[in-house]
Structure formats: structure tokens, C-alpha cells
């Protein structure tokens, strides 16, 4: 199970967002020029040898065990080589930045992903992990939101009714093949 986590006390201000929209959720469309940006600060003030990789996950954020070359085009592991040293501050820190996709690593497949940053090219020395989504418009969804129809939820919850139109996608067993996740996203751009 992978979550959003920081494993070192000196790592602060971790942000993962769509490029150009700092307050956005980390979601981009497969095959477009959209990018995600990960930023974090290392308050130790020392320049560290960080690397990163991507893990493709299932709907429950467990590793999908698909071979990395099936979902990554390019190098499987890369150094974090975009950084800036602090200046004119009361204490020293280093700000690190990763943009995805990039020239070294591109996505081949949509899905749930975890970006894992680790030290000294040692995947046992994990520094942080952040979840994000890559999606593709494979289906069309038609939906409505209304007040809950079950008495226990009236006044506090909503009901979402929807239909999935999938003319170019074969779904033989919807209970096994389809998982619906409803997220309330902000419209901040």
C-alpha cells in the first residue's frame, strides 16, 4: 500500500501539482504536454544525492506488479538534478524539483502512480512518496448529482447517478473491471 508520506524529519514543504496550477490536484492527461511538478525542501542545508522512480498502482494503491517498461518510456530511475540552494535566509536549505514527464521518463499507460524519492540510489532509503493520477478519455460519463434519497443521508449527503458510455472499450464483467472513484476537485487554475 502506497500513500503520501515523508520519511525524513528534514524534508518539508512537499508539493505535487499540475504545472502552472500550484493548488491543483496531481492529475494529468496521458499523451498531452501537461506536466506534474514535485517540489520539496531539505532543511539539512546539505546537497544530497536523491533519485526517483515511479510505481504503477491498482485502484487501492497497491503495486500493480506490471513491469516498469510497460508503463515507463525511458529510464526507470533518474537523479533529482534540479535544485536551488537557499540564499539570504536565516538557515540554509535546498529546494529540489522534478517535472514529469520529462526527457528521461514518460508515461505509456494511464492509472494510479506513486512517485518515490530515495537517497544514494538505494531504494531502501526512501525519503518521500506522493500519489498522482494519469488519465485518458477512454469512456464518456453522463451524470447527475442530487439530494440523497435514503432517509439516513438526507440533508447531509448527495447521491450521484451516472452512466458510462464505452463504445470502444470492451467491458465483460463490470463488477470486476470497473472501479468508480468520485473526487471533489477544486476549480483553481
Predicted regions and their residues:
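Contiguous beta-strand segments within globular domains
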Residues: 6-56, 152-168
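Ligand-binding face of N-terminal immunoglobulin V-set domains in extracellular IgSF glycoproteins
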Residues: 92-105, 110-120
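Short acidic/polar inter-strand loop motif in beta-rich domains
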Residues: 59-61, 105, 119-126
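Beta-strand-rich binding/interaction modules
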Residues: 52, 111, 172-183
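Extended, solvent-exposed segments with strong compositional bias
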Residues: 72-93
